[in-house]
Amino acid sequence: MKKLHLGCWHRDFPDFINVDLLDMPHIHYKSNINELPFFGNSEIDLIYCSHAFEYFDLVEAKDVLKEWKRVLKTNGVLRLAVPNFEALVEIYKRTNNINKVLGPLYGRMEINEGKNTLFHKT
């Protein structure tokens, strides 16, 4: 089974091919996750992407999903994890602290590749 972990950052799962923009020892392909030219059509059984998809805007997201579909086998699985809006509302109601929810909703992540900063597009 061929499994991809897209936008893996520091997480290294056994038996996954890791793709991320950052250069870390466990990264197999240092690349953006919106284009996967190093994989052929219908080559991948499983794509896992946790808290990276929200960095694409609506137009980009459509193209990204097309690309991921291209590399997935016909019965392949796409597993996405994105911010849980309902959970964030509950946190706000419980704490009354807007700063606890702004990061996950409109967060930013600075990366060590030049002057790059990634912002959520949600």
Feature annotation, model-predicted:
Residues K2-P37, E86:
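Class I SAM-dependent methyltransferase SAM/SAH-binding core
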Residues I17, Y29, Y48, L78-A81:
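Conserved Rossmann-like nucleotide-binding pocket used by diverse enzymes
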Residues M1, I44, K73-N75:
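A general structural motif
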Residues E60-K73, V77-T122:
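S-adenosyl-L-methionine-dependent methyltransferase catalytic module, highlighting the catalytic core
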Residues N34-I47:
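A short acidic, Gly/Pro-enriched loop at the edge of an enzyme's catalytic core
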Residues L46-A52, A61:
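A short beta-strand submotif of the Rossmann-like class I SAM-dependent methyltransferase core
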